[in-house]
């Protein structure tokens, strides 16, 4: 064995490549070994240093891959054991044990996290060269007993299923020990680069290679100053020194110092010496030179997004200077925090990149499909799971529009559970859903699922066969091929599909002869899919490499950007979590020689120093170290290592916000420039954060309150929300000439409430999501129907019998049966409605002097060539003198207010009067009024009554009265009925004024509507608060900011209010 060390200013790779070349020139086969995380970059670096740029004599690889070169022909043809397969084996082993067999872990048998921990422990035991029987000295002896039972049973299953329990390194070591590879190894030289420690498995293999290979050469970075130190605790080279010293002591060899021809920039060497002096308690009498600072930059940004954008702009600048993407390395302090953000930002700046991390499959549509399938079976056809299956794009041949239509209907009809999905869809609504098409789609969905889900407990092999048949029926493979939109997505889908088929194969192999329920089968496949990962190799080498900073090696790239270096992540504090604590691992390690667990927490200090040293020397030209103030929405401090650099004289540059400018870095890229233009256009919207906007909004409210106290006014802000008029072509289509515009009293109210709301409802025809569950609209229909039946019954039956019959027959109608007999909640609503009917009906019994002329009367009121008003009158009554009136049933309290009517917000009763006047017989000229009847179950506060007597009954009937507009001429006839006429009597001239002004409101609205320009103008009654529909989610209307756009209602003092409004009406309607 040969041990080599060198200073950070030299290239250890060049030194080791020269050693490898010498051995190759002598005819030896050379294996150049690098850590798993660095083998790809190391191979490129080694081949670059070779004069011939390539050779068959030097193989750059990893320990595991090296073993395959020697054992590929002699390896037994056994099944491969990966993490997913291991998890399934442990699951099968736990299935065969009873909870009482495992005192410590019996309750965790079906826990997926526990199974994952078992897999990790088993792999650790293999790497540590330990067996489960070596787990002595645990905190609780029962833990070892349980683990022995589980792992031994799992190993028995592995033997039965012909799985290879040995790792590749164990197989390699066994072959060496048996002498099967002596001839090959005698002609082999092993060069090891980039290691600062070996696992027990690697350590054992190394001892065998040292005894059988021609030579083993190991290199590491250690300064001569550190090598000569007797006390190395806390030294930045502590990890490498321990590494070399342990090897030197074990193999009785002295490390030698070497240098390379390539010497890196002195600035990095001087920074390293300062860093070393800080940690070995020595002093230097010099500082960094001014030109040294050109090679280092310390950035501080507010948050991650700004930090990544600054890096992207700097990379674009480097390209402008002539460098290439492959010259740049980006290191992340926290992979999870940056992984989701860095991709879109680099895409915006058109920077190709390769993220050196395996991607989890959890977000792939195939995994979402499998998860939805499993949940559909477990939760009995829950609607959300069925829809998620369809939306994955992997189920059947359905367009997105078909899935949207199916989703809309299932939400409307509340389809959930197997019972409802299995029955034909029969319920429809005013939207007239295409039930024939939806039922065909339902069958295409239900039949294959039903065939699969009816599977009983059976052999795993049979379940897999049925699952595969199901996947063929729904064309999963064909749909999977259609998902990809680019070559990269094709490659990703191929990797995911390969992992999926491997999982199915493993399941078939392990559980083929075991009886399982379908739910267990799907759960196991889902767990395997969610925990699986895949990796895609970049299509070109000219990309920016992105990886975690703790995987970096010295002198990696000319330009290195390390971001996210906060105190929480640099240095990293690794704490092991698993079935064994670090204390238990340490006790086991004290007993065993050459076989040991890796205890990450014990290595934190020296490993972090080694990582920081490698990071500070990662670049050969320029190193940028960046830290955000806020990471993952949490404030964080500077890393202690960065604070040391600041003490060395490196300035901390506050990059601040990404201010828009005309610099080359801002406008030098097309896609980035487009993004900047959009940002400039919206600059007034993004100048403040949401928190800042909230603060200043509250401040503005407070300021206005104080100004009002001092009788001062704050100028109202200008209009910020504007709408565009419709084009002439759209106006011609929506409002064709010669055809009157159809309006209703409700539509007119919506228009005067907020013009934009009218545009959404009656021009775009946008509707809220419907539901079969009864709402206020359906409740109103029910009450209307009961009273319609009741008033049509002219038999001599007692009134109570008539009421019972009306309720009974209404309840028997198919629509109301579907609505109110669907569940207990709907039945409870029906019971409340019946109580309301019984409470309100007596008012009809009391008014025996009226005659019901008509009910549910449709009308079309002609107001000229441009408008046609339509609607339905609930009831037309006739008094004993022949005069007619209109009754409108309401499920909530309503009362006619002349001010509200004047402002266009309550035209219903006057519109019904106008319609009644038009449709009334010619011999009837008198109208007695239009009124609301509040259908209610009156609530009384008994505390206000001294005793229960007639006053209580009178109060109930007082609440059940007609309220509205009444003719003064019919005052005598109305006094005997339940009519509230106080402040509600109008003369015939005044009624005529109301009718004329009502027509004026309609004509005014039609004129504005046909212009095609709808304002965002919800009404305000006091100029301080907005009562109209603001539609905030669509219009972004804010009362404090947009009060100038609100329509101010005309309000008058209560005294002579009626006369004043009538005067205004006559004036405006030109009467």
Curated annotation (Swiss-Prot):
The keyword DNA damage applies. This is ATP-dependent helicase/deoxyribonuclease subunit B. The gene is rexB. Keywords: ATP-binding, DNA damage, DNA repair, DNA-binding, Exonuclease, Helicase, Hydrolase, Nuclease, Nucleotide-binding. Its cofactor is Mg(2+). GO terms for biological process: double-strand break repair via homologous recombination. GO terms for molecular function: 5'-3' exonuclease activity; ATP binding; double-stranded DNA binding; helicase activity; hydrolase activity, acting on acid anhydrides. The heterodimer acts as both an ATP-dependent DNA helicase and an ATP-dependent, dual-direction single-stranded exonuclease. Recognizes the chi site generating a DNA molecule suitable for the initiation of homologous recombination. This subunit has 5' -> 3' nuclease activity but not helicase activity. Heterodimer of AddA and RexB. Despite having helicase-like domains, this subunit does not have helicase activity. SUPFAM superfamilies: P-loop containing nucleoside triphosphate hydrolases (SSF52540), Restriction endonuclease-like (SSF52980). Belongs to the helicase family. AddB/RexB type 2 subfamily. The keyword ATP-binding applies. Its EC number is 3.1.-.-. It is an enzyme of class 3 (hydrolase). The lineage of its organism: Bacteria, Bacillati, Bacillota, Bacilli, Lactobacillales. Pfam families: ADDB_N, PDDEXK_1. It comes from the Bacteria. It comes from Streptococcus pyogenes serotype M18 (strain MGAS8232).
């Amino acid at each position: 064995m040969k041990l080599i060390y060198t200073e950070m200013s030299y290239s250890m790779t060049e030194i080791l490549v020269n050693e490898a070349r010498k051995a190759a020139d002598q005819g030896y086969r050379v294996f150049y070994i690098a850590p798993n995380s660095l083998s790809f970059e190391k191979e490129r670096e080694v081949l670059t240093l070779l004069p011939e740029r390539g050779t068959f004599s030097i193989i750059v690889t990893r320990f595991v891959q090296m073993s395959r070169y020697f054992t590929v022909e002699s390896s037994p043809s056994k099944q491969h054991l990966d993490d997913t397969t291991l998890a399934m084996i442990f699951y099968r082993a736990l299935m065969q044990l009873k909870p009482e067999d495992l005192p410590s872990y019996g309750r965790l048998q079906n826990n997926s996290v526990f199974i994952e921990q078992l897999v990790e422990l088993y792999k650790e035991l293999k790497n540590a060269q330990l067996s489960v029987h070596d787990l002595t000295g645990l905190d609780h002896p029962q833990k070892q007993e349980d683990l022995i039972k589980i792992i031994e049973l799992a190993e028995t299953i592995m033997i039965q299923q012909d799985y290879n329990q040995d790792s590749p390194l164990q197989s390699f070591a066994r072959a060496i020990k048996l002498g099967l590879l002596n001839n090959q190894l005698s002609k082999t030289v092993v060069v090891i680069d980039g290691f600062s420690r070996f696992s027990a498995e690697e350590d054992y293999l190394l001892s065998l290679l040292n005894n059988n290979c021609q030579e083993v050469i190991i290199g590491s970075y250690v300064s001569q100053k550190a090598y000569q130190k007797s006390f190395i605790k806390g030294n930045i080279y502590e990890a490498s020194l321990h590494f070399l010293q342990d090897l030197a002591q074990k193999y009785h060899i002295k490390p030698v110092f070497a240098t390379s021809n390539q010497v890196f920039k002195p600035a990095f060497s001087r920074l390293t010496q300062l860093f070393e002096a800080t940690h070995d308690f020595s002093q230097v009498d010099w500082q960094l030179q001014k030109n040294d600072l050109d090679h280092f930059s310390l950035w501080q940004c507010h948050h991650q997004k700004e930090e990544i954008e600054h890096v992207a702009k700097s990379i674009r600048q480097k390209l402008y200077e002539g460098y290439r993407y492959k010259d740049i390395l980006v290191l992340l302090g926290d992979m999870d925090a940056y992984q989701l953000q860095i991709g879109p930002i680099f895409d915006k700046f058109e920077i190709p990149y390769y993220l050196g991390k395996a991607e989890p499959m959890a977000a792939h549509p195939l995994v979402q499909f499998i998860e939805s399938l499993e949940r559909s079976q477990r939760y009995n056809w829950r609607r959300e799971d069925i829809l998620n299956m369809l939306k994955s794009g992997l189920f059947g041949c359905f367009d997105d529009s078909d899935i949207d239509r199916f989703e809309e209907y299932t939400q409307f009809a509340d389809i959930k559970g197997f019972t409802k999905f299995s029955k034909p869809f029969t319920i429809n609504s005013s939207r007239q859903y295409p039930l024939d098409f939806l039922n065909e789609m339902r069958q295409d969905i239900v039949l294959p699922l039903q065939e699969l889900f009816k599977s009983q407990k059976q052999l795993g092999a049979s379940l897999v066969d049925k699952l595969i048949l199901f996947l063929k029926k729904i064309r999963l493979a064909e749909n999977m091929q259609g998902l990809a939109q680019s070559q990269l997505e094709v490659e990703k889908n191929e990797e995911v599909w390969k992992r999926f088929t491997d999982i199915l194969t493993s399941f078939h192999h392990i559980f083929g002869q075991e009886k399982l329920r379908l739910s267990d089968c799907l759960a196991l496949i889902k767990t395997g899919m969610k925990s699986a990962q895949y990796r895609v190799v970049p299509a070109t080498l000219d990309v920016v490499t992105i990886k975690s900073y703790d995987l970096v090696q010295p002198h990696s790239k000319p330009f290195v950007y390390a971001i996210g270096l906060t105190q929480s992540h640099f240095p990293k504090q690794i704490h092991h979590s698993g079935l064994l604590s670090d204390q238990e691992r340490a006790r086991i390690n004290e007993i065993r020689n050459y076989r040991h667990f890796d205890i990450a927490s014990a290595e934190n200090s020296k490993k972090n120093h080694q990582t920081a040293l490698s990071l500070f020397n990662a670049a050969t030209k320029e190193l940028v170290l960046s830290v955000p103030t806020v990471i993952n929405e949490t404030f964080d401090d500077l890393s202690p290592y960065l604070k040391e650099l600041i003490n060395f004289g490196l300035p901390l540059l506050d990059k601040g916000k990404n201010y828009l400018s005309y610099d080359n870095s801002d406008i030098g890229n097309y896609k980035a420039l487009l993004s900047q233009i959009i940002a400039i256009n919206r600059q007034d919207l993004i100048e403040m954060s949401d928190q800042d906007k909230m603060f200043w909004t509250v401040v503005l409210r407070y300021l206005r309150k104080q100004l009002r106290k001092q009788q001062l006014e704050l100028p109202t802000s200008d209009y910020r929300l504007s709408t565009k008029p419709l084009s002439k072509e759209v106006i011609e289509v929506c409002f064709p000439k010669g055809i009157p515009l159809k309006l209703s009293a409700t539509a007119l109210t919506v228009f005067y409430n907020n013009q934009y709301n009218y545009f959404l409802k009656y021009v775009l025809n946008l509707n809220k999501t419907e539901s079969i569950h009864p709402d206020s609209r359906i409740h109103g229909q029910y009450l209307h129907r009961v009273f319609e039946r009741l008033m049509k019954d002219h038999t001599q039956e007692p009134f109570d019998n008539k009421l019972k019959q009306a309720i009974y027959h209404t309840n028997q109608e198919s629509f109301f049966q579907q609505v109110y007999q669907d569940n207990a909640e709907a039945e409870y609503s029906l019971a409340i409605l019946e109580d309301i009917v019984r409470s309100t009906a007596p008012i009809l019994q009391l008014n025996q002097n009226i005659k019901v002329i008509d009910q549910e009367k449709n009308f079309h009121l002609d107001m000229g060539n441009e408008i046609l008003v339509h609607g339905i009158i609930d009831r037309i009554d006739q008094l004993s003198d022949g005069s007619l009136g209109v009754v409108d049933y309401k499920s909530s309290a309503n009362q006619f207010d002349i001010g509200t009517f004047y402002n266009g917000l309550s035209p219903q009763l006057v519109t019904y009067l106008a319609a009644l006047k038009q449709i009334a017989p010619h011999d009837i000229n008198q109208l007695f009024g239009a009124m609301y009847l509040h259908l209610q179950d009156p609530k009384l506060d008994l505390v206000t009554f001294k005793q229960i007597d007639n006053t209580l009954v009178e109060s109930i009937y007082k609440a059940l009265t007609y309220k509205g507009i009444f003719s003064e001429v019919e005052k005598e006839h109305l006094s005997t009925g339940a009519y509230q006429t106080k402040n509600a009597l109008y003369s015939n001239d005044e009624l005529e004024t109301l009718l004329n002004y009502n027509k004026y409101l309609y004509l005014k609205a039609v004129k504005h509507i046909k212009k095609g320009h709808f304002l965002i103008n919800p009404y305000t009654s006091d100029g301080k608060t907005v009562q109209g529909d603001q539609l905030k989610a669509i219009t972004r209307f804010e009362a404090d900011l947009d009060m100038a756009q609100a329509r101010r209602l005309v309000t008058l003092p209560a005294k002579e209010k009626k006369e004043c409004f009538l005067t205004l009406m006559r004036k405006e309607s030109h009467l």
